[in-house]
Amino acid sequence: AVTVKRMGVGEQILLADGEGLVAHAVVAETTKGELTAHVSEVTRETPPAVTFTLVQALAKGDRDLQAVEAATELGVDAVVPWQAERSIVQWRGERAEKARRKWVAQAEAATKQSRRATPPRISDLVTKNAAAQAISATVAEGGLALVLHEDAEASLAQVELPSAGDVMLVVGPEGGITPVELDAFVAAGATPVRRGATVLRSSSAGPAALAALLGLEDDLEVVAVAFEGLVRLDAQFDVQVAGRS
């Protein structure tokens, strides 16, 4: 960090332990690869009354990773990788744990980038039934479960958030959520909602909905930072695909 950020004496920095503790400090001395800082204040982040969980379907071209990155920068509290029926990517055997660690690393990097005190929790991979059980548990505890779906009658803008509890947001893969999956989630207590008139990619649908729920749509700087990487990586992916065709 000293080399990459070119930190100098007198600069103010934030140090976090990843569990909500934040130290405000001033750089006192720097050497190659190391620095000494004087801590001026230590605070502990208060857990929010309302938390947000993104159930993200596995997607090709690292679009799911892009969603994890942007959602983390926007403030998501937990991310659940979901093996949807139409997911092209498959997590099996040793690949499952390796892929999950990649999600964890992406979330940790985005946490540092956005100067969050706590990274989001990345759960183990779930299938339809496990996702439905998680939805049922969330609703039973007074939370809210929403499924992004282009044919939904309710609009995301009409959603009223609970005063406390978890808000679970389910995002499908490139091919969309199957009728069987949607029926299972609705039976578990989820509400299908549409974000708007346009259909977004799996990489951006979750973060866009999250920004709306968090009331960040008017904060152009926050949203622009979170989506800058999505636009860049999506463009690179499209170029690569075009080159292979």
Positions of PLM-derived features:
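N-terminal positively charged helical leader segments and presequences
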Residues: 1-45, 94
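Residue-level signal for inorganic ion chemistry
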Residues: 10, 71, 107, 185, ...
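Gly/Ser/Thr-rich beta-alpha loop segments that engage phosphate groups in nucleotides
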Residues: 12, 63, 174-178, 198
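Short, ordered loop/turn segments at secondary-structure junctions
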Residues: 18, 42, 83-87, 174, ...
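RNA substrate-binding interface of SAM-dependent RNA methyltransferases
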Residues: 44-146
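Active-site/ligand-binding-proximal alpha/beta "capping" segment
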Residues: 142-182, 190-194
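Structured adenosyl-cofactor binding patch, chiefly the S-adenosyl-L-methionine
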Residues: 179-220
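Alpha-helix boundary/capping motif
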Residues: 220-222, 229, 235-241
